[in-house]
């Protein structure tokens, strides 16, 4: 187990950070074609792990499958994301989640992830590198459009993901923010 932990980047992240530093750290990017994404990233020259097949059983005994790989390294101290592909297409997955009542409406109303905010020393340089590496269209000078959500790069010393911003329908939640460890969750 120790050897496997040493080899897998996400396990190394957890071993290095936890339990002292609960933080938003490395984002996941979902792919519908992980093999093509893997090949494209390898061609850019970054170090990628092998693609690993994973699975677990949900509480009802159904097998949930996925494929995953990590991108080693960073841009000016900001670690790269990891890439994940679920073992079923979105429509099938959503149908299964609804049948299991896991895709039920949230009791507080509609909540949608809108932004992942990264605090970095040089926002434009990091944005430009991630745009070149990941292919997302630019959003202003310091952001990327990530399929309807946004990566926002703000100037600061943390060099990590620091905040998740959610759009909410419930007026009582608007303007609220809370912290879990070193991560901020904000509702707009």
Specify the residue positions occupied by each region the protein language model found:
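Vicinal oxygen chelate
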Residues: 2-108, 112-122, 139, 143-188
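Internal, well-ordered alpha-helical scaffold/interface segments
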Residues: 82, 111-114, 128
């Amino acid at each position: 187990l120790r050897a496997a932990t040493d080899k897998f980047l996400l396990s190394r992240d957890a071993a290095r950070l936890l339990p002292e530093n609960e933080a938003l750290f490395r984002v996941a990017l979902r792919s519908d074609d992980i093999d093509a994404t893997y090949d494209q990233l390898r061609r850019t020259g970054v170090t990628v792990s092998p693609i690993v097949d994973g699975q677990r059983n949900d509480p009802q005994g159904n097998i949930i499958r996925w494929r995953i790989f990590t991108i080693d390294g960073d841009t000016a101290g900001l670690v790269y994301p990891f890439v994940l592909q679920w073992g079923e297409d979105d429509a099938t997955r959503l149908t299964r989640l609804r049948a299991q009542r896991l895709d039920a409406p949230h009791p507080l109303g509609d909540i949608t992830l809108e932004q992942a905010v990264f605090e970095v020393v040089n926002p434009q340089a990091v944005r430009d590198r991630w745009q070149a590496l990941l292919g997302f269209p630019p959003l202003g000078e310091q952001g990327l459009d990530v399929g309807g959500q946004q990566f926002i790069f703000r100037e600061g010393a943390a060099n990590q993901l620091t905040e998740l911003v959610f759009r909410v329908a419930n007026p009582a939640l608007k303007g609220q923010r809370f912290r879990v460890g070193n991560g901020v969750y904000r509702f707009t």
